[in-house]
Amino acid sequence: MASDLEELRGIGKVTAARLQDAGITSAYHLAIMNPEELEEMAGIDPVRASRIIMEARRVLKMTTEPVNALEYEEIIKENPRLTTGVTAIDELLGGGLEPGAIYELAGEYGAGKTQLCHQLSVTVQTFDEQLRGKALYIDTEGTFSPQRIRAIAPRFGLQPEEALRNIYVARVETVVALEEAVREAAPRLLENDSIRLIIIDSVIALYRAQFKGLEWLARRQQRLNYVLDWLKRLGRAYSPLYLVITNQVLTEMTPTKPGAALRIPAGGNIIAHASTHRLLLRKAGEKHIIRVLDSPYLPYKAQAEFKVTSEGVEDV
């Protein structure tokens, strides 16, 4: 709220009102902005913007002070993992999803990406009381299904209405709306409600549809990078926060094997560098396979099997 901002040194009622009008309603939200964004959104001079951002970070003790690797290892170990509800996938991921990391689920239509996202929206509600949270599901393709949540919830001991009440759905149809959802709506929800999971399904769809042609490629990649950068900022500032994006795939011919083709994630180097863990999903008969494409510590090409049933995503 404006009163929260006014408590920061260097921010009076006028500046607090300008920030609030721009959608920046708390010290936490202010602390993860950069000066150029404040100039664009609230008309604040970059030099002054830099000062008030640093003040917000100081008050919130958001330090960049390095720690030794042993201490860092302990911090990571203490992070609670989010279960997928599938033992084989949890084991593949080292115990479930880690907070702050971006998990990319890439695959063709019917590979199981959206099914897994729906299930994660439910499992995030099954933590113990202290960590139990809600989900923000940013839907760019109209694939979110309340009926699917109703079918999955009882398997995890939740009433369907309760599970649905704990999932916020943002249906976005333009790149601008997606950016607003991540930069403005998400921080507000994180401040005012116990959001523990953000899903973007799919992260690439709007960019491929609305930036057509090679002449728009550089602009498209810049805008895509901006949204992914905001996800990272949110993950660092509002821990524990779990981050999942889905991605489409492209067909790439292999020069060494004429007639053969590879399925590779769309989005180029931007998504490749932004994602912490890249996972490729595919359907194989009656079962589905999830395979590690890239990760800081998960074994390359390690995989797990799962099936999609009327009650969600399950072990084979």
Predicted regions and their residues:
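The Walker A/P-loop phosphate-binding site
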Residues: R18, E55, V59-E162
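Phosphate-binding/switch region of NTP-binding enzymes
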Residues: Q221-N225, D229-V316
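Amphipathic alpha-helical transducer elements in NTP-driven molecular machines
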Residues: T83-V86, D90, P99, T143-P146, ...
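A short amphipathic alpha-helix within small helical-bundle interaction modules
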Residues: L5-L8, L19-N34, L38-M41
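Conserved catalytic network of the ASCE P-loop NTPase/AAA+ motor domain
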Residues: G95-L97, F127-L131, L158-A163, R188-D193, ...
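Conserved inter-motif catalytic segment of the P-loop NTP-binding fold
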Residues: R132-E215
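Long, low-complexity intrinsically disordered regulatory regions enriched in P/S/T/G and acidic residues
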Residues: M1-E7, A16, K61
